[in-house]
Amino acid sequence: MDESRSLVAKQLIEAVPEIDKAVNNLKVIVVGAGDDYDNVKTMADSVNQKLGRDVIVLTGARTDINKLIAPCKLFVGVSRAALEAMAADKPVIIAGNEGYIGLFDESKLAVGIDTNFCCRGCEMSNSELIKRDVLKFFNLDENKQKELGEYGRELIKKEYSVTRMADDSIKVYDWALQKNKEILISGYYGFKNSGDDALLQAIINDLKQYKESPNIVVLSANPAETMEYYKVK
């Protein structure tokens, strides 16, 4: 709950009195700690006092986020936190200090991907936008609410799963290995030091096991001799 990340929490708290009028048994859970926690808590306490009950609960820092997300119906947040909520099958309102995307569905996919779900370059968030989309969500029938959660989860499984990330990484490595780029080796070479010469030979042998005819360049005090003996540049 650092000041650089607490804007939306404050805006949501500001909107709670109006949302509470329309949503029965409203409960808002704010998770996190940081240098702005006390200010956020002061706002929450003031709203709770005004409403006469603890609508807003601040948990402080937590590591068991899954247990807090599981019972919720709607998540408000940004970036990785929003993706984690989507992975848990929860509808999300994507909003952060950098901007506002809103209640996430297929129509918001392009801007979500373009901004890495961080909202940079989007319209700025404010309490009215948050209130509008929270009420919009709770006015949907249960089937539509469920569909929003399912859409987010399927997106995570398809585009942001561990398997997908690993596959993408492997593709990058495969692409790099196909390029005939020079492999530069720098060390204490060309000085007839048996230890360093043995190390260089071992490195070259290992590289040749992984790639046939690697394009190796060695920085050496005696380039001609090193090139002739090790068959490198």
Residue ranges and their predicted role:
Residues 33-35, 62, 80, 220-225:
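Short, polar loop motifs at secondary-structure junctions
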Residues 40-61:
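Nucleotide-activated donor-binding/catalytic signature segment of Leloir-type glycosyltransferases, i.e.
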Residues 67-83, 89-93, 98:
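Acidic donor-binding loop of glycosyltransferase active sites
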Residues 136, 143-159:
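A short, well-ordered alpha-helix in the C-terminal region of glycosyltransferases
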